[in-house]
Structure formats: C-alpha cells, structure tokens
C-alpha cells in the first residue's frame, strides 16, 4: 500500500464505540415498606439529559442521565437516577458535525442500555416495571440548541443585533 493511500485512509471520518458502561445508579425508596400497601395508581415523572466531554484528542465520553420519580399521592414511592455512559473514538469529523454526533448519535446508542438498567432496578426493588418510551434525540438536540440561542439572546439584554440611527441597540 502506498503512502498516499495510507494518508487518504487516515483522513477518513472515523467513529468507534470503545466502551458502554453504567457510570452511576441510585435508588431511593423513602416511604417503604408502607408505600407497597397503597392502592392508588402512582404518577410517574421522567427526565432525560445528555452531556459530553472530551477525554483526549478524538476520544469523547457521552453520558445520558435518566431520572424516574414515582409518587403515590404526595409520597415518593421511589426515585431512580442512572448515568449511562459511553466512550467514543471520533476522528476526522468536520467540526460542524461533531456536536450533532455527540448530541444525537451517541445518546441514541446509549439510551437502550439506560432503559434496560432503569427497568431492571425498578423491578428488583419490588415495583411494577416501568418501560421508558423511545426518545427522539434529534428533537431533544434541536430543543437544546433553541434554548441556548434564546439564553444567549437574553444574556445580550434582549438586543436584536440591529443598531438604531442614534447608535443604540434595537430591543426585541
């Protein structure tokens, strides 16, 4: 193989899953065993967040955090929080494609593991299984971008970027 072919291969976009692991998990049952005697149907609240950090050149950790809180009336039946993580080797990817890769593709890979771990700990705790629904990480990513843009605009004091004839900033 020639040096030119090696260079071309070295410049190709590269994506590899190095490891998927459960970084942290906690279960709290503050009202057990009494909560098991309740007959009312519980309410369930689910929150999912995504974070990413660079560990080394081209090596990233992505963490999907899921929190499930179940209440019967005003009493917490249980609270589960899990951090499902993965280490990804991502090289030669254009900068504008890196953030969507970390915010959409990687969480999509990790989420089934998170769902399984949360469902498992809930049933092992003696509660009826809760199966988390699928998540559209593309939509979640776009919502985060929109919120960040709105926050940035708010930090600028509501300036629209338009300069008025008197030199002041137009407000929106």
UniProtKB/Swiss-Prot annotation:
It is found in: Cytoplasm. GO terms for biological process: protein folding; protein tetramerization; protein transport. Residues 152-172 are annotated as: Disordered. GO terms for cellular component: cytoplasm. InterPro entries: SecB, SecB-like_sf. It holds the Pfam family SecB. Its main location: cytoplasm. It comes from the Bacteria. GO terms for molecular function: unfolded protein binding. SUPFAM superfamilies: SecB-like (SSF54611). Keywords: Chaperone, Cytoplasm, Protein transport, Translocation, Transport. One of the proteins required for the normal export of preproteins out of the cell cytoplasm. It is a molecular chaperone that binds to a subset of precursor proteins, maintaining them in a translocation-competent state. It also specifically binds to its receptor SecA. NCBIfam families: PRK05751.1-5, secB. HAMAP family: SecB. Homotetramer, a dimer of dimers. One homotetramer interacts with 1 SecA dimer. Belongs to the SecB family. PANTHER family: PROTEIN-EXPORT PROTEIN SECB, PTHR36918. This is Protein-export protein SecB. It comes from Cupriavidus necator (strain ATCC 17699 / DSM 428 / KCTC 22496 / NCIMB 10442 / H16 / Stanier 337) (Ralstonia eutropha).
């Amino acid at each position: 193989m020639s040096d030119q072919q090696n260079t071309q291969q070295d410049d190709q976009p590269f994506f590899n899953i190095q490891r998927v692991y459960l970084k942290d998990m906690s279960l709290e049952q503050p009202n057990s065993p009494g909560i098991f005697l309740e007959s009312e149907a519980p309410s369930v609240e689910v929150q999912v967040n995504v974070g990413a950090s660079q560990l080394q050149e081209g090596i990233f950790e992505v963490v999907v955090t899921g929190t499930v809180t179940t209440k019967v009336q005003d009493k917490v039946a249980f609270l589960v929080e899990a951090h499902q993580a993965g280490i990804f080797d991502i090289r030669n990817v254009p900068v504008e494609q890196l953030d969507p890769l970390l915010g959409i593709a990687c969480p999509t890979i990790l989420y089934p593991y998170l769902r399984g771990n949360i469902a498992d700990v809930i049933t092992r705790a003696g509660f009826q299984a809760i199966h988390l629904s699928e998540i559209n990480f593309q939509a979640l990513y776009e919502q985060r971008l929109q919120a960040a843009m709105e926050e940035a605009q708010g930090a600028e004091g509501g300036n629209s970027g338009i300069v008025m004839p008197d030199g002041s900033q137009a407000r929106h």
